[in-house]
């Protein structure tokens, strides 16, 4: 753990992404994009949701180019530019395969040490819940020096929908998300349960459940908090060559 305390610290760095303009998204997993060279390509869209508020044909997008014999498509759509809460352009991370890796890097950098305490190990996709039929995103084992020796079950949710400066999850009905809340409550009190909304845009100042999209999720969210589930909304800034830590944001008063 290196001790990540300064907002703006780079957590992930990568080769600069290629920029283009979105033509259309279709069949959920596909997006046609015109690159800056004028070439039109089809990219993989690693986001199964409706992408409410961040899907705008004609918007600027950023893509990762990773050709491989094992991949049907050489391009992956990573980021989208949208009008931010203040009207200025804002880049949003739309690849839902990334947040688990990003939150793991956040923990390993020590950015959540004050909230989680010292962590000895991190395991991903560990079976848990009823009949071990679900998998927790991250299972953390505290060090011997951690004041709370309970294992930490941590669920990550990519969050891109907003209402003004409030980040909202979910943006559609999610029975899977409802189930995750129930299962997080199920590990209490012998373990800690932590929900981490990954706020994948820098223009938000707080987090709240997306009640208008999924009222049942909102009800379960409130039950989970009362039961002892911890919520740590983590905000990030997405750039062409990396992702930067911007700190924890508060939960909106419910």
Swiss-Prot record:
<dbReference type="InterPro" id="IPR040452">
    <property type="entry name" value="SfsA_C"/>
</dbReference>
<protein>
    <recommendedName>
        <fullName>Sugar fermentation stimulation protein homolog</fullName>
    </recommendedName>
</protein>
<dbReference type="InterPro" id="IPR041465">
    <property type="entry name" value="SfsA_N"/>
</dbReference>
<dbReference type="Pfam" id="PF03749">
    <property type="entry name" value="SfsA"/>
</dbReference>
<dbReference type="Pfam" id="PF17746">
    <property type="entry name" value="SfsA_N"/>
</dbReference>
<comment type="similarity">
    <text>Belongs to the SfsA family.</text>
</comment>
<dbReference type="GO" id="GO:0003677">
    <property type="term" value="F:DNA binding"/>
</dbReference>
<dbReference type="InterPro" id="IPR005224">
    <property type="entry name" value="SfsA"/>
</dbReference>
